C-alpha cells in the first residue's frame, strides 16, 4: 500500500477521536517527523515571512503598522521574523490552540542559534541586530530558568509585540479598519470554499483602506511531500465522493485551483495586485487521469501547484455609488 494512503488513513481514523489534534501531534512527532524544527525548515519559514513583508513594502514603501497572520500553527516563526524586521504590532490567530509553551521555547532557541551562527540574514535581509540580540537573551533566560513553563506563552510573545489569539476574526472587532498587512501561509488550501469566503470577507473588513493582503497557497496534493512516488496532481484523479473518504478534518485539502481562489478574492472585495504562480509540466500531469470535475479547468490553471498572491482592497472609484 502506498505510504501516502497509510498516512491519510491514519489521519482519517484519528479525526474521529475527541483529542484528535493531540493524537495527530503524537503521530507527526514520533512517526513522520513533520514537526522537527530543523534549520532548513526554520529558514524556509522565515523566508516566507520576509516575502510577505516585502510584498507590502514593495507596494506601500514602508513597514506595516499592524500585521495580522491567520494560521499560527505549532511554531510562531513568521510573527517572530516580522518582529525581527521591525514590525511593532503583530497579531497571530489560530482557530485551534496547537502551539504549546515548549514549541515557543524551541522556536526561540532555534532562531537564537541562527543568530549566533550569523545566518539570520540569509532569510531576513532586513533583520535588526538589536532585536535579534534581545530575542537570543530571552531564549537563554527561558532555557536557564527552572520555571521556564511558569510564564504564559502569550506573555512571552507580547514581549515581542506579538498578540496570540485562538478563535475567529469575529473576536477581533478592535482591529476593524486598522490592519495594514494580513497574511496566511499554506492555510487557505485547508479550508472549504465557504470558509475561505468568510475568512477573506473578515480580513477585508479588518483591512485599512491602504491595507495589503499576502497569501501563500499550496495548491498541490500535500501527500506528495510525504510520498515522493506521487505527483502534486495526484488528488485530482479522485471524484468528490472518493476524495471525501480519503480527506480528513485533521488534514483537509479542498483541491481548489488557482482560478477558484481568484474568484473568491474578487467576491470578497479584494483586487489582485501581484500573482506569482509555480506551474508543473505536462509530463508531470500526464499520469493523472483527471476526475470530470477538473476536466473543465484550463490547463494553465490545473498546472499551478503553488502561488503567492498579493491583494489590496477593491475600493470604489471616486464618484461611483457605494
Model-inferred region functions:
Residues 164, 263, 272-322:
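A C-terminal cap/extension of S-adenosyl-L-methionine-dependent methyltransferases
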Residues 197-212:
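A short glycine-rich, Lys/Arg-flanked "PGG" loop and its adjoining helix->strand segment in the class I
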Amino acid at each position: 500500500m502506498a505510504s501516502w494512503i497509510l498516512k491519510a488513513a491514519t489521519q482519517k481514523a484519528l479525526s474521529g477521536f475527541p483529542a484528535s489534534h493531540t493524537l495527530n501531534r503524537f503521530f507527526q512527532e514520533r512517526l513522520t517527523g513533520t514537526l522537527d524544527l530543523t534549520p532548513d525548515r526554520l529558514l524556509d519559514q522565515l523566508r516566507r515571512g520576509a516575502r510577505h513583508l516585502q510584498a507590502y513594502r514593495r507596494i506601500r514603501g514602508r513597514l506595516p503598522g499592524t500585521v495580522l497572520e491567520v494560521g499560527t500553527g505549532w511554531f510562531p516563526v513568521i510573527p517572530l521574523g516580522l518582529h525581527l524586521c521591525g514590525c511593532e504590532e503583530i497579531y497571530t490567530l489560530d482557530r485551534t490552540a496547537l502551539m504549546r509553551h515548549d514549541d515557543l521555547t524551541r522556536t526561540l532557541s532555534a532562531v537564537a542559534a541562527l543568530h549566533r551562527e550569523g545566518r539570520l540574514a540569509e532569510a531576513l535581509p532586513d533583520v535588526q541586530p538589536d532585536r535579534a540580540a534581545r530575542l537570543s537573551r530571552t531564549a537563554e533566560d527561558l532555557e536557564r530558568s527552572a520555571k521556564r513553563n511558569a510564564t504564559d506563552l502569550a506573555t512571552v510573545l507580547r514581549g515581542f509585540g506579538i498578540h496570540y489569539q485562538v478563535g475567529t476574526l469575529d473576536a477581533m472587532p478592535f482591529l476593524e479598519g486598522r490592519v495594514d498587512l494580513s497574511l496566511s501561509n499554506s492555510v487557505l488550501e485547508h479550508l472549504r470554499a465557504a470558509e475561505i469566503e468568510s475568512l477573506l470577507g473578515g480580513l477585508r473588513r479588518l483591512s485599512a483602506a491602504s491595507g495589503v493582503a499576502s497569501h501563500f497557497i499550496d495548491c498541490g496534493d500535500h501527500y506528495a511531500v510525504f510520498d515522493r512516488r506521487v505527483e502534486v496532481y495526484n488528488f485530482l484523479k479522485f471524484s468528490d465522493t472518493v476524495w471525501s473518504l480519503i480527506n480528513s478534518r485533521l488534514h483537509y485539502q479542498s483541491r481548489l485551483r488557482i482560478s477558484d481562489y481568484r474568484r473568491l478574492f474578487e467576491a470578497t472585495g479584494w483586487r489582485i495586485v501581484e500573482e506569482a504562480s509555480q506551474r508543473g509540466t505536462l509530463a508531470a500531469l500526464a499520469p493523472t487521469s483527471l476526475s470530470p470535475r477538473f476536466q473543465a479547468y484550463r490547463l494553465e490553471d490545473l498546472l499551478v501547484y503553488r502561488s503567492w498572491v498579493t491583494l489590496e482592497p477593491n475600493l470604489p472609484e471616486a464618484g461611483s455609488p457605494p
